[in-house]
Amino acid sequence: MKKVEAIVKPGMVRDVLSALKAVGASGATVVSERGQGRGARPLIRDSKGTPLHTAEYNTMNSVITIVNDSMVDTVLTAIAKVVVSGSKGSGKVFVFPVDEVMDLETGRRSSNSM
């Protein structure tokens, strides 16, 4: 099994979730986060009437799903179709091995099933 984590702009989350569902990924977790990548950070004000300054972080979201090894290429292709824009700061996708899963309802551990 593999953990696929797509770090995308907040406006892309629904598209990524729809793409995952369309290819048969059975679930996903969405996490809001801040980070410093190569993308330009927005100009913001700390409060009304204060001068503009560059934000320290960009706001992004991680869409995380666990899939069988055989689905990884399909999932990556589906994400790329809806997210790849050619512009800096669009995000990244990481793939990690998942050695074991523990179901917290039953306490059952498994190396090959969700």
Language model features with spans:
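Positively charged, small/polar-rich N-terminal and surface patches that mediate targeting and assembly
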Residues: 1-114
